[in-house]
Amino acid sequence: MSDLRIAVVGLWAEDVPATAHFYRDVIGLSLLAHHHGERPHFDLGGSYLTILKGRPVPAQDASPPHFPVVALAVEDLDAATERLRAHGVEMPWGVEGDAQSRWVKFYDPAGNLVELVQFEHRA
C-alpha cells in the first residue's frame, strides 16, 4: 500500500475557538472556508489538521518525554520562532537541532505539544 498518506490529523481542545485562533493567527495555517460544524479544518497541503472538542491527555510514562503530538515543517524556523515570541508563546526547550534539521517545541492553548521543524537543504 505505497499510496497511503496522512489525510487528517486531529487535535483535541476544550476551547476550540481559542485553539483554532492560535493555529490560524499565530501559526499561520489556512482555515478552510467550510468545515464540519464545530470542527475547524486547516489545510496542510493535501492533508488536514482539525480541532475537536475534548480534553487532550498527554501520554503516560512517555519515552521520550517531550515528543510532539504533531510536527509541522516550516521553510524558515527563525521567522516562525519570532512570530511565536511576538504572540507570547513559551518555547521551554528553545531551538534545538542536529545535522538534518532544527526545531522548536511549544504547547498550544489546549496543552498539545507541537513542534515546528525546518529540514536542512543539502545541495
Regions found by a protein language model. Give the residues of each.
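N-terminal beta-strand motif that seeds the catalytic metal site of vicinal oxygen chelate
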Residues: 1-20, 68-72, 120-123
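Mid-chain, well-packed structural core segment of small domains
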Residues: 70-84
